[in-house]
Amino acid sequence: MSNTGSLRRTERAPLSAAFTRDGVATAIAALLFTVILVSFRPFQPAGAEMTGDGGDIVNQLGFGSLGAISIFSLMAFADPRVVRSLLSPSWLLMLAFLVLSVVMATDPPSAMRAASFTLIGILTMATILALPRDAEAFSKVIIFTSVVVMGLSYVGLIVFPHEALHTTASLEPEHAGLWRGVFTHKNIAGPVMACFSFAGLYLYRRGQRLWGASIFCAAMIFMLHTGSKTTAGLVPFSILIVVLPGLIGMRLGTPILFALAIIATAIATLGIVFLPPVKHLAALYFPDLTYTGRTTLWEFAGEMLAKRPWTGYGYESFWGTPLLLNQDQPFDRAWDIRTIVHGHNGYLDIAVLMGIPALCVAVYTFLIAPLRDYMRIPLRKENIYLGDFFMMVALFAALNAFLESFFFHRADPVWLFFVFGMFGLRQVSLRPMAVRGLS
């Protein structure tokens, strides 16, 4: 998003503006955002697995096209300064660890195919942020994407109920009746709708009351029907942590509360497994606290990580691989690790797949750098509103990652929104946002 735009020109010729250079760039950003969230296989519970399947021609062509369109759009429509500013040194180092983990994988060609989807997803999110010229154009992208994705999800409940809803015939019959919309699982649908609720709040705060309130309410209703208690709790928590300090004139409180929330969550989750004092207290006062069996996975992952702490096991080379399929399953283990596709903790999974050094870089890139960017945001209304939106997304996803694993997971919508929030914070911290008339 750069800082060009004319209020009079927009008011005088709204239709013709859609066919200008800026109008085309905005339309491309909206279409890219919508397509990558809906995916090329909507309403298919198996779609998440097929995303990385090298033999899936639909995904190969689809994501290849997204990558090509993104590169062309960046070259043709984006401000080169904006493009150069998106990738920081820490992000380049993080991507270098990703490439190294591909080389270290048990099947490098397959890992490279999966990583290519991840890289295309990152490229696409960067393009979506770089193309809109100002806050008004960005708002149009948000409105279009929210309406289409949520509209398809709601329509799917009626037209494709067996695909848009978890049923007793699903792999997890205990989730029967819970909503998932166009997505593959309720645990993806819930966080995506949470991010749309943040988008609605952003639109409402900048003056687009009707769009903002409608998107916020529709997203919250859908999110509540996914049955995700964690998501339902994190949404108001994220909003309060970001918005409240600014309202009382203590904007510095947001990064402080962010850091405290991350530390507390880390101690309350991984701490009860890996920190002896915390583990003792948890066993004493909360003996049944296992996060639905996740602590079993974390203990096992920690034991395996101790064998390869520096390099990990390689990208796509741990969960669901022969390494675990050939493991014995103790009778008292809560979950069968042989059938698990990820460790239900994104930070631990980074260490297991890429090594502890990569985890250290990830902590800085994903948790510390966004706080620095947030504090650098110019104190202008549009920058503050947009920065708060990106911070809500980043905080929500960062906390959610302690119970779910989506970092570098191909084109996972939750991962894409997290990238969106981090890149967005960096971009909005570097330049003032222009203002045009609200529509």
Model regions and ranges:
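Aromatic-anchored transmembrane helix interface
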Residues: L87-A96, P108-A130, V141-S146, V192
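Membrane-embedded alpha-helical segments of multi-pass membrane proteins
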Residues: G54-L74, A115-T124, I188-S197, G233-L240, ...
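Transmembrane alpha-helices of multi-pass inner-membrane enzymes
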Residues: G387-S439
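Alpha-helical transmembrane segments of multi-pass inner-membrane proteins
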Residues: L66-S70, L98-V99, S139-E174, G181-L247, ...
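A membrane-periplasm/extracellular boundary helix in multi-pass inner-membrane enzymes
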Residues: Y154-P161, H225-T226, V243-L289, G302-K307, ...
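Transmembrane signal-anchor hairpin modules in multi-pass inner-membrane enzymes, especially those
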Residues: M1-L100, A130-K140, G207, Q427-S439
